[in-house]
């Protein structure tokens, strides 16, 4: 419950809220004092240490970021990859999946279009087919209609927990069960949910999940988190890759590629350290407050708003 949370103190950490009531976190989360100070710390470290900051501070800061996100979703840090965007994440995962002419990927028209775009591009090259389930209302996709499109031909099912257009909470667990029956990978876009709705990736047996700092995780742009279930990591070999996927990237060996045994194998280039600093503070804010508390508070405020309009 929320009795032990001082919401006014938390609110005071966001200077923007001194001026306005903000209702657009679904587009961009506000900057907290902690995240602003973290950005200044990054600048000071860069100014003071130059390139040596990579080894004294920055690489460890990236690892700390993985630990914080893993804590939030009940995963291990080794199951987390740091990516620059969901588009990059889906491109890497797509490159791990061999698609024959008759193989299928199932998504919906309410899921963020970067998912369909990636596989549409492959479809144009004769690599699989994309089935995009339509919505009658543009608010939600009928779950039974969605699962009717999943078959033994399906290689990947990709959908959202919260639809970005409407905020509707999708019954993804029902979809996941049917994907599992048909031995298809399940990819959950959780960008509009993580931080405001609790999730336990182990309890739900999710294969792959992406989220990011831009919205409800209060970290700003340039950071996406990708969870890949431990049992899947070594089964997936990306062809969209980069030097940070290598087990020993600092050997700078162009002759061999030996992927990391962790989810780092799905990373590509150098992470944006300027984005890592505020993103870590955003995650700490969410973890310290507690997602269950945030959810209860959101429902309470929503109820007050609805009742005031009746």
Predicted regions and their residues:
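Pyridoxal 5′-phosphate
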Residues: 1-310
